[in-house]
A protein has these predicted regions:
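Active-site C-terminal subdomain of aminotransferase-like
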Residues: 258, 283-388
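N-terminal entrance/gating region of PLP-dependent enzymes' catalytic architecture
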Residues: 1-133, 424, 428, 432, ...
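Conserved PLP-enzyme active-site core in the AAT-like
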Residues: 141, 145-317
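Conserved PLP-binding catalytic core of the aspartate aminotransferase-like
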Residues: 392-426
Length: 474
């Protein structure tokens, strides 16, 4: 393919994507894919082609085979999981990143990649109202950032002994603390960082599903009495199930008293802190050691773009640094080598999409959109509160509303069957997509707002469909 053919085919692909996005915004596809397991693969040739194939035929396969196998995360009727916005400016940034084909092994390998990532992370820091004490880097996902945080915590607790001698260097079991509402990535990070699942303590939550600081204090004291080594606390700002917010100020008081690392997982909810009126939700954040939030979720920077902030970058670099001779340069003492800020040696030019998003939309437009999403959640919460037979199961600090329809006389497994039944009918209709989740030992339904194209009319239509399906025959 020469540059002229690339130009011609590139226009064709951009047109295809633009048409697809317009069709998604109009609701022309079922929101959740209806394909059966294995259906997409079975529709495609099992062996690779020997000769080149024309793009027209490839785009036909894309439209007829691939798209039906896609769940449409940018559909305005998508209320499942969490928002994972892909703003068009960020899409172009991703395209430019791939076209520039930069590989960030060190500063010299791509000075622009390194310095734009520093800048984009610092822009976001300013937008969030964080102090200059924080330094940021872009990781792929919050799972990776949490793993890096726990490795840093491990090395601080062992005075870098684990890095030198492995897990055998610690004479006492190292303990990690997180609430029952924390993300599953915390357990995986503890496993991969060598703590082991048995050394993750699940701290009880209060009636708002937030970690109880006094319970954390008791758990730490119990471990110390047993001769264990408390190491790190992972607090959550915006839990996956209910967007519960752990009390960072109180938790930080406990971690300071015991010299524990405090990592804050604000993967989805952190974007809300570009709104000054939301920042009280993470009061105490300046006392944390590390923080992760994902601009590829609510903000719109396209997956994957997860920002990891630390207060002690020198410690991070010491923990993560490798310095083979073939990567050393004369500039090393004057620049940031991002290979030492995380796990991978190389990195994509992820900063381009975040930089383009912020420049093309501006802070004001981003704030406006997030405020609209918060209003959608407040509207639905009020409707649920006023409707007979409906229960709102958790506070609504941000954009997720947790609900259950409870017909008279229905409880236990019968109520679970009812809940799963009406949400399944909504999802199968193709007119909306919701995800159920367990709260305690019973099923409920999460309504998560945040898709860029969602307007009030879509929220009204969803509530109407929820009532139709749940109240049918009750």
């Amino acid at each position: 393919m020469d540059s002229e053919e690339f130009r011609r085919l590139g226009h064709q692909v951009i047109d295809w994507v633009a048409d697809y996005r317009e069709r998604v915004a109009r609701g022309e596809f079922p929101v959740m894919s209806r394909v059966a397991p294995g259906e997409v693969r079975a529709a495609l040739p099992a062996a690779p082609p020997v000769e080149r194939q024309p793009l027209d035929g490839i785009l036909d396969d894309l439209a007829n085979i691939i798209v039906p196998g896609c769940t449409h995360w940018q559909d305005p009727r998508f209320f499942a999981y969490f928002p994972s916005n892909s703003s068009l400016a960020a899409v172009l940034g991703d395209f430019l990143s791939t076209g520039l084909a930069q590989l960030g092994l060190n500063w010299q390998a791509s000075p622009a990649l390194t310095e734009l990532e520093e800048l984009a992370a610092d822009w976001l820091r300013q937008m969030l109202g964080l102090s200059e004490a924080w330094s940021g880097v872009i990781q792929d996902t919050a799972s990776t950032a949490t793993l890096v945080a726990l490795i840093c915590a491990r090395e601080r607790t062992t005075d870098y002994g684990a890095a030198r001698g492995g897990l055998q260097a610690s004479e006492r079991p190292l303990i990690v603390y997180a609430s029952s509402q924390s993300h599953s990535s915390v357990e995986k990070a503890a496993l991969l960082a060598g703590f082991g699942r048995a050394n993750v303590r699940v701290v009880p939550v209060d009636d708002r599903y937030a970690m109880r600081a006094e319970a954390l204090q008791k758990a730490i004291a119990a471990d110390e009495a047993q001769g264990n080594a408390p190491c790190a606390v992972v607090a959550t700002v915006g839990s996956t199930a209910t967007t519960a917010i752990d009390p960072l100020e109180q938790i930080a008081g406990v971690t300071r008293a015991h010299r524990l690392w405090l990592h804050v997982d604000a993967a989805m909810a952190g974007s809300a802190m570009i709104l000054p009126e939301c920042r009280s939700l993470w009061s105490g954040i300046e006392q944390a050691d590390s923080l992760v939030l994902n601009p590829h979720k609510w903000l719109g920077a396209c997956f994957d773009c997860s920002t990891y902030f630390v207060r002690d970058p020198q410690h991070l670099v010491r923990v993560m640094s490798t310095n083979p001779s073939y990567l050393r340069t004369a500039a090393d003492t004057r620049v940031r080598n991002l290979r030492d800020w995380g796990i991978p040696l190389g990195r994509r030019f992820r900063a381009l999409k975040l930089w383009l998003l912020i420049r093309e939309q501006g802070i004001q437009a981003l704030q406006q959109r997030l405020r609209r999403d918060l209003e959608h959640a407040r509207w639905l919460a009020a409707e649920v509160d006023a409707a007979a037979g409906w229960r709102r199961l958790a506070p609504v600090p941000l954009q997720t509303v947790c609900v259950r329809h409870v017909p008279a006389g229905l409880s236990g497994e019968a109520l679970d069957a009812h809940t799963l039944g009406w949400v399944r009918r909504i999802n199968q209709s193709g007119r909306a997509f919701l995800t159920p989740a367990m709260l305690g030992d019973r099923w409920m339904v999460r309504v998560s707002f945040g898709v860029e194209a969602t307007e009030h009319q879509h929220v009204v239509a969803l509530w109407r469909q929820m009532r139709e399906e749940a109240e049918r025959g009750s």
